[in-house]
């Protein structure tokens, strides 16, 4: 039974909050730190690469989910320390991508691939 609500990403954030809950969460998840989770993040990125190399779309989808979980995990760790949260991560990458693509989002005309 799914006890979470909202969009799938909201549900994933709620799931991580539950896993990290100080008294009702998972003992393993509660003990994790940025440093202890980092190797899993790298491992998941390599698993995405492997699934892409195998052209296995089902595995790509699954591994991207595992990688997304790592981002949500790190964001939750940061939120608990008052550093930032998942929404801030998303806002920052949105801003960065818009700034890096003035030819798409700005007043500049469309550029060819050679000029990008």
Question: What is each residue range found by the language model?
Answer:
Residues 114-116:
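Conserved small/polar residues in nucleotide/adenosyl-binding loops
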Residues 1-23:
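Charged, compositionally biased N-terminal leader segments and the immediate start
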